[in-house]
C-alpha cells in the first residue's frame, strides 16, 4: 500500500505531538532576534540569535526548559501559526498551513537532518549570539536573508 506521508494527509490540527515536532526543519531562523516597528507593525530579522540557539545544530540548547531562560520565546502552536507573519517562507509549519508541500531538503523528505544546512537554508554560520553584542545595537544587525533563503531552490519542491 502506498500511503501518503502524514504532512500530505493531515492538517496541522490533526497531527500528533511527535508529527508536529518533526515539522521543524532545524533551520534556526525562528530563533533569530527580530525588531518590530511599533507604528507599522513591520518585523525585521537580525543576524543575532537567541542565547539558547546552538549555532551548529541550529536547535535550541534548552528546548524543554527554554522559558526558564527566555520567557518571551514564542511557542509555535496549531492556533498561532496562521497568525505569525514573520515565519520564514521555507518554514514547514507555514508551508503545511498554507496547503503546500515540504521542500526537498526538509529532513522529513530527505531523511537527513543535514540537508537543511547543506542547501543553505539554515542559520548555520550566519549569526552572532545575543550574548556577544550590545542589545542596544540590534538594529545594526538587520538582514533580509531569512526571508529569501532558498529562493533559487523554491521550484524544487517535492
From Swiss-Prot:
Origin superkingdom: Bacteria
InterPro entries referenced in this protein's UniProt entry, alphabetically: Puta_zinc/iron-chelating_dom, UCP006173
Family: Belongs to the UPF0260 family.
Protein name, entry field: UPF0260 protein RHE_CH01262
